Amino acid sequence: MSVLSWLLDLLYPPKCVLCRKLLTGKGPVCPHCMDKLPEFDGAAPSVRFTSGGAVSFFYEGQLRESFLRFKFGGSAFYAQTYGAWMAHTIRDRLAGKYDVLTWAPVSRARKRKRGYDQSALLCREIGTQLRLEPIQTLRKIKDPPAQSTLADAAQRRANVSGAYLSLIHISEP
């Protein structure tokens, strides 16, 4: 451990990314929370317009609260933990089944407000873990209402319709 890391840990002791209690051991999650993570171990979900997907954990409880802190609460450093978990899931469940690593970007206004694009941070961390360079394939050209304000999948699809511009051309083989 470097002197700088030691000083930072002294001034800002590391906390569990889920419950935010002080960590006594190594890793970003305390043993209590690690045992209670809502791990998804079922079948691969069906993802429209793709040949499949993978889920690391159910989006509920402390994990959901933690992810909302990452997304809206200035906890950009959580990307390391979430990215590592997602990369592990990709290696486990999607090895050899993907062609590109990309993300759906937030609007400039949301990026300015938050200070970062959480999707891009996650994608870069996953890329680091998988030794795969992410490729930006989309640009957000409209800033519709937040998806979280909408009630169902149909409203969410309609909300993002026309919001993104493709930066690449994909041709059929």
Which residues fall in each region the model found?
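Glycine-rich phosphate/pyrophosphate-handling loop used in enzymes and phosphotransfer proteins
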Residues: 1-171
